[in-house]
């Protein structure tokens, strides 16, 4: 019985740890291919404000506003495509 409880405890801890990370795209090309595991709960995508098809960067977190750059922040895995 103690072994079963210990096993359940370990599984719970592992599952909670996996749930605390996110997967975000992390690159500067239009093709979303490279991913990174993030501790933050948000992903971002930067693009040129007047030319949204030009991606200036993707990654973890939510950076502050910049002139001439549109920043889209989101809160789910691979949401910054």
Swiss-Prot record:
<keyword id="KW-0964">Secreted</keyword>
<keyword id="KW-0732">Signal</keyword>
<feature type="disulfide bond">
    <location>
        <begin position="62"/>
        <end position="73"/>
    </location>
</feature>
<keyword id="KW-0800">Toxin</keyword>
<feature type="disulfide bond">
    <location>
        <begin position="24"/>
        <end position="43"/>
    </location>
</feature>
<dbReference type="InterPro" id="IPR018354">
    <property type="entry name" value="Snake_toxin_con_site"/>
</dbReference>
<comment type="similarity">
    <text>Belongs to the three-finger toxin family. Short-chain subfamily. Orphan group XI sub-subfamily.</text>
</comment>
<feature type="disulfide bond">
    <location>
        <begin position="74"/>
        <end position="79"/>
    </location>
</feature>
<dbReference type="InterPro" id="IPR054131">
    <property type="entry name" value="Toxin_cobra-type"/>
</dbReference>
<comment type="function">
    <text>Is cytotoxic against A549 cells (LC(50)=106 ug/ml).</text>
</comment>
<keyword id="KW-1015">Disulfide bond</keyword>
<dbReference type="Pfam" id="PF21947">
    <property type="entry name" value="Toxin_cobra-type"/>
</dbReference>
<dbReference type="InterPro" id="IPR003571">
    <property type="entry name" value="Snake_3FTx"/>
</dbReference>
<protein>
    <recommendedName>
        <fullName>Toxin F-VIII</fullName>
    </recommendedName>
</protein>
<feature type="signal peptide">
    <location>
        <begin position="1"/>
        <end position="21"/>
    </location>
</feature>
<dbReference type="InterPro" id="IPR045860">
    <property type="entry name" value="Snake_toxin-like_sf"/>
</dbReference>
<dbReference type="GO" id="GO:0090729">
    <property type="term" value="F:toxin activity"/>
</dbReference>
<feature type="disulfide bond">
    <location>
        <begin position="38"/>
        <end position="60"/>
    </location>
</feature>
<dbReference type="GO" id="GO:0005576">
    <property type="term" value="C:extracellular region"/>
</dbReference>
């Amino acid at each position: 019985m103690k072994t079963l409880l210990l096993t359940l405890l370990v599984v719970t801890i592992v599952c909670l740890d996996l749930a605390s990370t996110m997967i975000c795209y992390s690159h500067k090309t239009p093709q979303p291919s490279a991913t990174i595991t993030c501790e933050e709960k948000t992903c971002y995508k930067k693009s040129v404000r007047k030319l949204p098809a030009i991606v200036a960067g993707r990654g973890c977190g939510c950076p502050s506003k910049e002139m001439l750059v549109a920043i889209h922040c989101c809160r789910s895995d691979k949401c910054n495509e």
